[in-house]
Regions:
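P-loop NTP-binding core
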Residues: 1-196
Length: 196
């Protein structure tokens, strides 16, 4: 969602993962959703988590009886970086379902198969209840290339026992603009409408 912390002193997912603040304390409320923002410092958490069971850290932070927030929400979306490191493993371990967003680009298909391998490992060792909900194509355009990639993605999804959503996210300058100003898309659209 590309949302930064409200200010430099706001707690982020980094502090939650490190254990210096609770998930509840880090939540920021926006008109459209509640978020726990992240920043580039979060990438360093992989070097800092040395404890046994480090792949369970996020699950424990979200589900803790005293300080967790999992029971307060119908849905919690965990937006992961495009890597398959400890942060992604933590997210998969904490999740009930895996929604795989993938760009409608040729090389993105190989990323799906790599993620599937990680999914199988997490399912085997840390979260046997994890299920693939589906594959969501992003940055689509009305071109033959996109249609070809949709077909390829469909074959890969079928191999994984998943479906490709009929809904896609088309290429849109508003998404890029929202990322540039570090706002979630919904708030950005609303603020843009008020600006005229």
């Amino acid at each position: 969602m590309s949302v930064a912390a409200e200010n430099q002193d706001s707690a982020t997912m980094y502090e939650v993962m490190k254990g210096t603040v609770s998930a509840r304390e880090a939540i920021q409320h926006t008109p459209s959703c509640d978020i726990i923002p992240a920043n580039t410092i979060l990438a360093g958490i992989e070097q800092e988590l040395h404890n046994v069971g480090k792949e369970m850290t996020l699950r424990e932070k979200l589900r803790d009886e005293q300080t967790g927030v999992a029971e307060e929400y119908d849905y919690i979306l965990i937006d992961c970086p495009p890597s398959l490191g400890l942060l992604t493993v933590n997210a998969l371990t904490a999740a009930d379902y895996l929604l795989i967003p993938t760009m409608a680009e040729t090389f993105a298909a190989s990323g799906i198969t790599q993620l599937y391998d990680t999914y199988k490992s997490v399912k085997k060792y840390t979260n046997p209840a994890l299920r693939i909900d589906g594959v969501l194509l992003t940055r689509t355009e009305r071109t033959r290339v996109t249609k070809t990639i949709q077909e390829l993605t469909g074959k890969i999804a079928n191999y994984m026992g998943a479906d490709v959503y009929r809904t896609t996210i088309r290429s849109n300058v508003i998404i890029k603009e929202a990322q540039a100003v570090q706002e979630n898309v919904f708030d950005y659209i609303e603020s843009k409408a008020h600006r005229g």
